[in-house]
Amino acid sequence: MTVLVSAHRGGAGNNRPGENTVAAVERAVRLGADYIEFDVHRSPAGRLVVGHDAPTDESGVLLSDVVAALGDRAGAHVDLKLATGEHEAVAVVVAALPLDRIVVTTSEDSSIPRLRAWSVEHAPGLMLGLSTAARSHRGTRPSRWLAKTAAWFPRARMRRAGVDVVVSHQLIARYWLRSWARRRGLPLLVWTVDGTDALRYWTSDPHTWMVTTNHPDVALALRPH
């Protein structure tokens, strides 16, 4: 099985101003990235926009424009940064792409059952993954620390959510989550892998489904053919 390559934040690499832009997506598609990863937020006015950080104005790139730039080959790796109304963002992607080219990830536990319920009618078979990234938390400092600590031990969370894909930081995947995913027959999506040695390792791993990287050109060159 060939490990798929997902271009993180549109595959802009070290070009931070170019992250999550239509130009970055188009470049990653030309490179041959299998999927393009992008973060989805809601602007202050309620528009669905793409960008790493929560928007403070209306200058963000529209989600619909990024999806249109994927063309007819690359898949969408939709990383939701929304705690409510998630289905509205996913609906934009589902309207434009076939389901076998979409994977939706989030760090919000409650998003998975809501999206699952929505998908039964609107997108049956939609792949949903809960990330080991820390959940958003605005509580006290101890509760925020607990949320970050829990991110390193996500198996119970993933089991309760009923995920279709295990979305893991590369260190957590290497030490214990990869074997857990394998025992349950779940595909493994590893993030964010940038070093040459690490890319060579993960793109050759028979138990990995997808690797997210800021350098899709390097990953594609190292991936066994």
Language-model segments: residues:
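Phosphate-group recognition and catalysis centered on beta-loop-alpha active-site segments
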Residues: M1-H225
